[in-house]
Amino acid sequence: MQVVRDEPRVAAVARLATDDGELTVVSTHLSFLAGWNLLQLRRLVQGLAGERRLVVAGDFNLPPDAVVRASRLRPLAAGATFPAHDPVRQIDHLLGRGGVTGTGARVWDLPLSDHRALSVELSLRVSPAG
């Protein structure tokens, strides 16, 4: 039996003040180990339950359908991101909730990673109360 060691995983959280209210943005890199990455995603989203407007972005090491089922967040962008030299699948994601929408999604070929970068222009819907 061989044990695969995974590196520690974290999420960086920023709360941004915008003209349309506060937005919480999270960047993460989930495990490559099947099942473990789903658990990490569920725990991350549970920990962010109180955040009204939310964007979660990063390398999830999961396909889009699994990400949506596990997170219950809305995809803001789509595109094949891996492997960088000939991308055939999306494992990097931009997700949102709370009136956050995305337009102009783009996949970038950058020399910095074995993944391609995914970007989107964000818009915040102003709630009737504010």
Model-inferred region functions:
Residues 1-130:
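Active-site regions of metal-assisted phosphoester/phosphodiester hydrolases
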